[in-house]
Each structure stands twice: as C-alpha cells, then as structure tokens.
C-alpha cells in the first residue's frame, strides 16, 4: 500500500463502509453486489488481455465471447434481479461496452412495457437467454431526436394480415443502433404506421433480421456495421435497410395501440405511452452519469494523493498535488457533483418505477412531468459529467492522456450519452415546453404540483426585483435549505423571463414556432436552472435521511460545496434577480475555498466509498493500493510495439541511414 494513501485513509473523519451502504441502498445490497462481483473476479472465464492493445475486430470478438459467457453464468448462478444483472454486466467487461447491451437495456424493457401478454410469452424468455438477440432501431441516417421526422414505414396489408416495412429513402436507413451491425437477429423497429391509407405516427414492431442458426440476413433485409467511431470499439453500431419486408400483424407491439385484422386502428390512451422505453433509458442514464463521474473522480483524486510535484516553499519536499488549492478547486466540486448525481439517480430510478406502476393501472397524471424531468436531467447530468470526466483527465497531467489512466476510455464511452436517447439541447427544450405549460397554468390561476410547484409562489404570477428585495438578508450560505430556496427563486425567475420573452415574440412574429426558435436560448437556460434546482433540492433532502453524524457532516460539506460552487459559476443570475447581493457573492466564493480545506482530509475516503474494484476502474493511476509508477512501467512494456527489439518498420529508416 502506498504510504500516502494509507495516511489519507487513516485521517478520514468517517467510516467509508457505512457510506457505501447508503449509496447501495442497504448493507445487504452492498454484500450481495460484492458477492456477485467476486463471482466474476474469481472466474478464469472472465479473464482477458488488456483490450487497449487489441484491434477493433479483436475487441468485438472478445466482447461477444464474454457476453455469451455472461448469459450462461447468470443462468448458472440464478441471477435474475434487475440490479443484480446490472452489477454482473458492469464488471464482466470492465470499462467497455457490450454488443448485446441493447438487448437488455432497450429490447426487453420495450417488450415488457409495450407488449401484450401473448407477445411477452412468445419473445421474452428467448430474448433473456439470447436465442433472440434484440436491438432497438429508432435512429435513422437523416433523423434522430426528431421522432416525428422518422421515415421508415410499416404499411398494413389486410389481405395477408401483414405489415410491409420499407426504407423509402437513403435518409430513412436505420443508423447507429448498437448490436445491429453483426450481433442481433431481431430488432424493435420504430416506423410510421399506415393502415387503410392513413398514417398514425410512430409505432414499435418486432422485426426478425437474421436467420436463427445461420445468422445470415433475411431476404429484404440489408444490414451491416457503420464503421469506426470516437469510442465504443466493441460495439457493432449498424445500419438497417428494409425493402418490402413483411412481418405478421402480431409483430406490432399492441399493449396500448392496436391494429385489428381488418386494418382498423385502435388508438392508445396517450401517444406518450409509446415513448416509455426512452423515458426508462433517460432515467437510467442519470445514474450512469453519476457512475461515470464517480469513477473519474476516484482515479483523479487517488492519483492526486500519490503524485508529488513542485514546491510550495523552496527547498521543502514536493507536496502531494492534492494539497494545491487549484487541484482541489478542479476536483472537489466534481466530487460533490458525483455524490449529488448518485442521489438524483437513485431518486429517478425509484420515481420511474413508481409512476410506471401507476401507468400500468391507467394513471397517466404524472407522465408529463416524468417525461419532462427525465429529459431535462438526462441532459443536465450527462453534460456536466462529460465535462467533468475531461476535467479529471486533465487534472492528471500527462499521464491522464494515456489509456493506462482509464480516463480516455471512460470519456469516449460516456460522451455518446449527450446525444443518444435525445440530443441534449433538444431534451432541454422538451423540458422547457413543460415549464412553459406549467407557467401558463399558474398565470391562469391554477396550481401546479411536483417539482414545478415553486411556480405557485410567483407573486401575482410575476417575480419583480422590488418584491424580493428583502431576500438577500435571508440567504444563509451555511444552510442547504436556504440555498435550495435561492435556487428555487433563480429557477422561477428564469422560467418567467423565458415565458415573457416567448410571449413577446409570439405577439411580434405571430408564429408560435418561429417565436419558440427565437426564444430557445432563454428556454434552455430556464430548463438548466430548473434541473439545477432539482439536484440541489434532492441533495439537501437526502441529508435529512442520514443517521450517522460523521457521514451527515461530510455529506453536508459536499452539498454546500455543490450549491455554493453553482452560485459562484452563475453569479449573474443571482445578482440580476436580486436573490443575492454582491457582498454575499464574495462570501460565497470565500466559503467555497473554506470547504475545499474541510473536504481535503476526507477526499480519498469519499472516493473509496464508491467501492469500485480496480478492474472496474481499469486504471493504473487510480489503483486502490496507490502503486502507480511500478504498474505504469509494467503496463507500457505490454505494448505490442515492444514485442520485438527492432520493429519491422525499421527497414524504411535503414534505407535512409545506409546513404549517410
């Protein structure tokens, strides 16, 4: 054990094990997660060479092989609980992604949420065992987030009781679905439904694309891999073109919308019910943002405790770089953010399942806010985590640029989250649409509930500076509850600004669509402020549920740092809204620096509490034992370029040197 890390752990003010239990949900969940992780760590079938040194084709082959082993092992060990499946999957491929991932994250959830009982009986068991390997084919070459613009068609033929699927244009070719290129034999295809000559919008269809047994594409199907990408080397993101391809009527998922044998269309209770899978994935992605940022913080903070550089005072020993205030300022707000997102992710998971149960009972009342909240928080957390991961990499200096740090892999494999399942700016605008509707309700004298209930407090449906002029004396920068109120006022103010600017543009431009576009910057800022408020609120409320005093104290410091750092980075909003005064902003900036000092002694213990196995981090720099330099040298020696003392390419240089 590196002596610096041992000293850091000995000086912690709390027991990291107890905090791990809180993050997992209970001591029993921690015990079971570790039990599952050890199944993999102690199983020789899951050992493999470092994927960093393999070609893309080799990485894909390893990923497919290990995915097949994973399914067999889960069956052998009786792992069926969704959380346990996630733990198992997260460790078996370390920091990399799996070709069959969408089978479990989208194909099966869509079948569960939108399939009839008969459809689930037909396909569910086979998809869980990978006899059917499914993917989710929504995005097309020409359209992604704009779902209504998708061009793939499914035209019903009542004579044969079949749907005829077509990709009528080049831009209608399905493009990007993971596992589509070479792995999957089925796809849930989103297509424009046409029956009796009339279009009814997007619906989901289960489409066989390869013959089971030979794995060859079926007649009418053109399918393949789209080529190398920024990351995701193990995933065969693919394309799918369909030419008059017929599937039975029963292959349309019909839990909500239906097409009768004669072609009669039966509409669902709500069109948004067909977007259930996207809402599920977006809520899941909030937790994934927390996980990715937590891993990056673990690597950067451990390395910063091991790395010694420069001199604070001439002639003195080189300090740990974690002792530099600038390094703390880079990393500790990100650590606070990681914890905030951990708690928000747990909230979103719980909220999704609660509301989804209600939807199953026919209660759609909370669906609009769930859709808006998952869209906004997916964007807010993924943008923040993506920027934060890169900041952690840069905080590790030159070694952070090496794949040995694990940070490049974390970054390139997380960054697609800013685009898939809804491009983030568009997601923020979807949240803004809900905020504008809520504002209009309040303006018309109605009350709103849920996370937007703060809009009910708008005095006479307006926030005016003179009406909140007394507010600055009320803000307590040492109180999470008081800071939550400040964020609430900021959100309300920016929502009102966006709403009033939108109204002005509507009057001036006459067209709501043009007005919306010309107000979109304000609308995105309103959504960001709303999401920021939600995160601060949930973090603050989580503190009240923590019973261990030492853990509550350190989490309170993190909550304060997250809230105050956000104010310092958005000071203009709090000043312009007369929510805080300039002297208070100065106090905020000073308090942020004080909190850096308070958190310093607990930083390593806080990342230890995330409880990532070394193999999960995939990082030489973030090793639990802190033995960085010895292992960095060993890692480099494994480079394929080092297999020969003289590389075969030397012949090109030798010919030049012979002329000297």
Swiss-Prot record:
Xref: CDD domains? AXO
Metabolic or biological pathway: Lipid metabolism; peroxisomal fatty acid beta-oxidation
For this protein, what reaction is catalysed?
A: a 2,3-saturated acyl-CoA + O2 = a (2E)-enoyl-CoA + H2O2; hexadecanoyl-CoA + O2 = (2E)-hexadecenoyl-CoA + H2O2; dodecanoyl-CoA + O2 = (2E)-dodecenoyl-CoA + H2O2; octanoyl-CoA + O2 = (2E)-octenoyl-CoA + H2O2
Name the source's superkingdom.
Eukaryota
Q: InterPro entries annotated for this entry?
A: ACO, ACOX_C_alpha1, Acyl-CoA_ox_N, Acyl-CoA_Oxase/DH_mid-dom, Acyl-CoA_Oxase/DH_mid-dom_sf, Acyl-CoA_oxidase, Acyl-CoA_oxidase_C, AcylCo_DH-like_C
Residues involved in FAD binding: 139, 178
Q: Does the keyword Thylakoid apply?
A: no
Residues modified as N6-acetyllysine are 216, 255, 267, 272, 437, 446, 500, 512, 637, 651
- Using the UniProt record, give the first listed, main subcellular location: other
Q: What are the alphabetically sorted keywords of the record?
A: Acetylation, FAD, Fatty acid metabolism, Flavoprotein, Lipid metabolism, Oxidoreductase, Peroxisome, Phosphoprotein
Instruction: Please tell me which top-level EC class this enzyme sits in.
Output: oxidoreductase
User: What's the EC number here?
Assistant: 1.3.3.6
Tell me the protein family, please. Belongs to the acyl-CoA oxidase family.
Summarizing the function annotation, the protein's role is: Involved in the initial and rate-limiting step of peroxisomal beta-oxidation of straight-chain saturated and unsaturated very-long-chain fatty acids. Catalyzes the desaturation of fatty acyl-CoAs such as palmitoyl-CoA (hexadecanoyl-CoA) to 2-trans-enoyl-CoAs ((2E)-enoyl-CoAs) such as (2E)-hexadecenoyl-CoA, and donates electrons directly to molecular oxygen (O(2)), thereby producing hydrogen peroxide (H(2)O(2)).
This chain's protein is named Peroxisomal acyl-coenzyme A oxidase 1
Task: Tell me what gene encodes this.
Answer: ACOX1
